[in-house]
């Protein structure tokens, strides 16, 4: 499973803000550094602001900053915020939620349930702080 562009861009932007906590950061800067379409990123940032994940300051000296500590924002929080959690509840073989047919599961149901639970636990236990700690080891390029 991969993240939607919306979730991916949100995670990149949040990690970038966490690495630049001493100042307000403009959407244009994040978009340029990470080659993200500015209009798309602006919508993502607006939603993060509406939901209280980031602060937004308007004006020529404005920009964005984190509204929460990086260790208080999980990957799962962002997945849920953008409505992508359903992807992690879907059957691998059928176009429905696994739970909808629990009495007649598909052939990979039990293995998938186990793995799906591990994936969700990983996302719920991984924070923006974890992502920037990885960045400091040069494995997650959010500051370049």
Swiss-Prot record:
Gene Ontology terms describing biological process: regulation of DNA-templated transcription
Gene3D superfamilies from the UniProt entry: Winged helix-like DNA-binding domain superfamily/Winged helix DNA-binding domain
Keywords, in A-Z order: DNA-binding
Gene Ontology cellular-component annotations: cytosol
A GO MF label: DNA binding
High-level lineage: Bacteria, Pseudomonadati, Aquificota, Aquificia, Aquificales
InterPro entries: TR_Rrf2-type_CS, Tscrpt_reg_Rrf2, WH-like_DNA-bd_sf, WH_DNA-bd_sf
Domain HTH rrf2-type: 2-133
Descriptive protein name: Putative HTH-type transcriptional regulator aq_268
Organism field: Aquifex aeolicus (strain VF5)
Pfam families the record matches: Rrf2
PANTHER family: HTH-TYPE TRANSCRIPTIONAL REGULATOR AQ_268-RELATED (PTHR33221:SF14), WINGED HELIX-TURN-HELIX TRANSCRIPTIONAL REGULATOR, RRF2 FAMILY (PTHR33221)
